[in-house]
Amino acid sequence: MIDVKAKLSEIGLTLPVAAKPVAAYVPAIRTGNLIFTAGQLPLVDGAMSLTGKIGEKISIDQGKELARICALNCLAAVQTVGDVNTIVKIVRVVGYVNGIPGFTSQPAVINGASELFLQIWGESGKHARSAIGVAELPLDAPVEVELTVEVRD
């Protein structure tokens, strides 16, 4: 079993409190041994850390860090319906990148989320993934990430 909070602490991070939904949904839902999160934005202490489009006023490296924040927020969402320490496999990551027209580096941005999961879970952090470019995101967020994990009973 991995102590997720300890692993986060080792890399200078802490598990945040889950953000309150901005509409009619829940942060995460469990069915069987799977937990699905709602899309998580790069909120820090309830506020958007940066807004706008990647490739305009936000660099790919900044976008990658925002995806990492989204990934942390996904773990916080998992914690609302279970315990992050029961995660046995990162199954799927879906990342949405609000980029300028012609922006095609979505995978580089979403690596910020993927790399965090690999740092924490190693081999069990390997996952299927989609990195999708979009014209806009809620609250003018540059990045949004969804997570599916398998947990033990």
Where are these regions (language model features)?
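Short, polar/acidic, helix-capping and beta-turn segments at strand->helix junctions
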Residues: 1-153
